[in-house]
Curated annotation (Swiss-Prot):
Keywords: Methyltransferase, S-adenosyl-L-methionine, Transferase, Ubiquinone biosynthesis. This is Ubiquinone biosynthesis O-methyltransferase. Its EC number is 2.1.1.222, 2.1.1.64. The gene is ubiG. It is an enzyme of class 2 (transferase). SUPFAM superfamilies: S-adenosyl-L-methionine-dependent methyltransferases. It catalyses: a 3-demethylubiquinol + S-adenosyl-L-methionine = a ubiquinol + S-adenosyl-L-homocysteine + H(+); a 3-(all-trans-polyprenyl)benzene-1,2-diol + S-adenosyl-L-methionine = a 2-methoxy-6-(all-trans-polyprenyl)phenol + S-adenosyl-L-homocysteine + H(+). Belongs to the methyltransferase superfamily. UbiG/COQ3 family. Pfam families: Methyltransf_23. GO terms for molecular function: 2-polyprenyl-6-hydroxyphenol methylase activity; 3-demethylubiquinol 3-O-methyltransferase activity; polyprenyldihydroxybenzoate methyltransferase activity. S-adenosyl-L-methionine binds at residues 39, 70, 91, 134. GO terms for biological process: methylation.
Length: 247
């Protein structure tokens, strides 16, 4: 794997230690398993709208080349492959790749998993119709450099979906105190609140990287139904954005 100025070794080490847990819905990645239907709803709707695809078709994303950055064990890569996309899953943590490969093989899916970075792929001339950049930007050392690499990875007209965590007292209370300290959904230290990014800050970074933001939604957890939903108004903790490379 090529070195990169945006890779934070301490952040990579956190997820290396949890690699075997990726496909355990009751394990350390339980929050991502719970959030995944909400994330997939947003991703599929945005891709369908941008590329004029019919989600009721058998393989609606056939012909689209998609990169899942920070793919982990493949929680998003696999659904995208099932929808017909040609999927490349990239992760900076080496131990995640064999976990993802094995699960894809067991599921009868063809996914190209690589231990690499966004910068290395961009330097190699790789280009994609869609880049998924989900819960990654808050873990990198230099968000602008990282997002600029994401822009380079997109073909003109390509779509980037980027999700992260807002930075405010509520997100500290829920994502750090609640999720890590009280509920213990995640190991302590998984997130660094100082690296969280407000929606306006992210939009500014996306524009500076050369992309055009076109949509953003909150992802809101309901403790009564124990489920996640999209919200046009509540971006106070988790949120997701869509951006397009115009040229």
């Amino acid at each position: 794997m090529e070195s990169s100025s945006t890779i934070d070794p301490a952040e990579v080490a956190k997820f290396e230690a949890m690699a075997a847990e990726w496909w355990n819905p009751h394990g350390k990645f339980k929050p991502l398993h719970q959030m995944n239907p909400c994330r997939l709803d947003y991703i599929t709707q945005q891709i369908a709208a941008e590329f004029d695809r019919d989600l009721s078709a058998p393989l609606p994303f056939e012909g689209l080349r998609l990169l899942d950055i920070g793919c982990g064990g493949g929680l998003l890569s696999e659904p995208m492959a099932r929808l017909g996309a040609e999927v490349i899953g990239a992760d900076a943590a080496p131990r995640n790749i064999p976990v993802a490969k094995l699960h894809a093989e067991q599921s009868g899916l063809t996914i190209d998993y690589r231990n690499t970075t966004a910068e290395a792929l961009a330097a190699a001339g790789e280009r994609f119709d869609v880049v998924l950049n989900m819960e990654v930007v808050e873990h990198v050392a230099d968000p602008l450099t990282y997002l600029t690499a994401c822009r380079e990875l997109l073909k003109p007209g390509g779509l980037m979906i980027c999700s992260t965590l807002n930075r405010n007292p509520k997100s500290f209370a829920m994502a750090i105190v609640g999720a890590e300290w009280v509920m213990r959904w995640l190991p302590k230290g998984t997130h660094d609140w100082s690296k969280f990014i407000t929606p306006d800050e992210l939009y500014d970074l996306i524009r500076k990287a050369g992309l055009d933001p076109v949509d953003r939604k909150g992802m809101v957890f309901n403790p009564v139904s124990w489920s996640w939903s999209l919200s046009a108004r509540d971006l106070s903790v988790n949120y997701v954005t869509a951006s397009v490379r115009r040229s």
